[in-house]
């Protein structure tokens, strides 16, 4: 079994969670298989080790799981993007639309400097709303996001197209159809 097959086979699918008609892709089952978890990190590192990345952002909360080890391997700072009220220093906020409402993300204003080449990492790419909000935060602080990495993509939900329209090249390890 190659690395991508190992990763995909390690992700459990949970039907009707969190609501009827949704199939939840559970990456916590992947982190319980050390070989699959290591393969995930290794493939992301390999992809970005020569891209001149100066910061890695992990989005709340499963982006932290994959972003932190990648940042360490690339020897660059790891930045957290969180829900409101979770970060202790001065923050900048960006709201974004959800299917039924709105949410907000924050990051420390001191985390990004002008010219930073930022890699954003999250576990799953669906509609791309979280990453679009993160890109806007970085751009407001004069950094740039040209790359975003995900363990899973749900291409039927349009996130890859949305990110490309923002000038961000998505990289995903495995895809699942549907929701």
UniProtKB/Swiss-Prot annotation:
Pfam entry (one): Pribosyltran
Cell location: Cytoplasm
Main location: cytoplasm
SUPFAM superfamilies: PRTase-like (SSF53271)
EC identifiers of the protein: 2.4.2.7
Positions of disulphide bridges: none
GO cellular component entries: cytosol
Record bears the keyword S-adenosyl-L-methionine: no
Alphabetically ordered keywords of this record: Cytoplasm, Glycosyltransferase, Purine salvage, Transferase
Catalyzed reactions: AMP + diphosphate = 5-phospho-alpha-D-ribose 1-diphosphate + adenine
Biological processes per GO annotation: adenine salvage; AMP salvage; purine ribonucleoside salvage
A GO term for molecular function: adenine phosphoribosyltransferase activity
Gene3D superfamilies, sorted: 3.40.50.2020
Transferase listed as a keyword: yes
Pathway: Purine metabolism; AMP biosynthesis via salvage pathway; AMP from adenine: step 1/1
Similarity annotation: Belongs to the purine/pyrimidine phosphoribosyltransferase family.
Biological role stated in the UniProt entry: Catalyzes a salvage reaction resulting in the formation of AMP, that is energically less costly than de novo synthesis.
Subunit record text: Homodimer.
Annotated PANTHER family: ADENINE PHOSPHORIBOSYLTRANSFERASE, PHOSPHORIBOSYLTRANSFERASE DOMAIN-CONTAINING PROTEIN
Annotated protein name in UniProt: Adenine phosphoribosyltransferase
Organism of derivation: Histophilus somni (strain 2336)
Gene: apt
């Amino acid at each position: 079994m190659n690395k991508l097959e190992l990763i995909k086979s390690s992700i459990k699918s949970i039907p009707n969670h969190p609501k009827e008609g949704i199939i939840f892709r559970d990456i916590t089952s992947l982190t319980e298989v050390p070989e699959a978890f290591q393969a995930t990190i290794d493939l992301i590192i390999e992809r970005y080790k020569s891209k001149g990345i100066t910061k890695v952002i992990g989005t709340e909360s499963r982006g932290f799981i994959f972003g932190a080890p990648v940042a360490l391997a690339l020897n660059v700072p790891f930045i957290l993007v969180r829900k409101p009220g979770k970060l202790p220093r001065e923050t900048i906020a960006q709201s974004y639309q959800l299917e039924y409402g709105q949410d907000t993300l924050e990051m420390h204003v001191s985390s990004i400097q002008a010219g930073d080449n930022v890699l954003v990492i999250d576990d799953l790419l669906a509609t791309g709303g979280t990453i679009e909000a993160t890109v806007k935060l970085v751009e407001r602080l004069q950094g740039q996001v040209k790359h975003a990495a995900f363990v899973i993509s749900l291409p039927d939900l349009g996130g890859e197209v949305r990110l490309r329209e923002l000038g961000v090249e998505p990289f995903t390890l495995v895809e699942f159809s549907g929701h």
